């Protein structure tokens, strides 16, 4: 090793010794260990609303939305979707059953209700919901009431359920009326029949479901 290289190595070693000495004075003989910087305080996430609160909130707008109406005449005349929204599989099902549906075939009605399940979104608001094709022009639905919602929001709950059920079923099949019954503990607490004509051209955002139910002859028991 040349003299110049030796001097460089000694200078480097001397520098490291001095740095260790400084560290020893500052940290009491030991070098500090690396620690991750503490994470910045994050704002606490707002508490999620309880299930009951969510149901109460959505109950006030339950009737304002509904399924898109199935155009069975369109489905009969076309092999593929014309609306740009319906899936090929679903359209194929509609196309297959369109002729019998338009003829008022109750077996076709029943199969469509089972496959399409138009009331599937409402299961969290009731203990059970059934639907039945009574005739070519009439569907019937019965739901077993959610006890808590019935107790807290009786008329609003019943009317909201009734109107949403009617809207979804009228959108699903070309019937003229839907009869809805609400039961609790084996007793009928609500009964109403909505006709297509009564619901036609309504702005449901501004509709009072209780007033409409009474207009349609509803019985709150």
Model segments located where?
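Long, charge-dense low-complexity segments
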Residues: 1-221
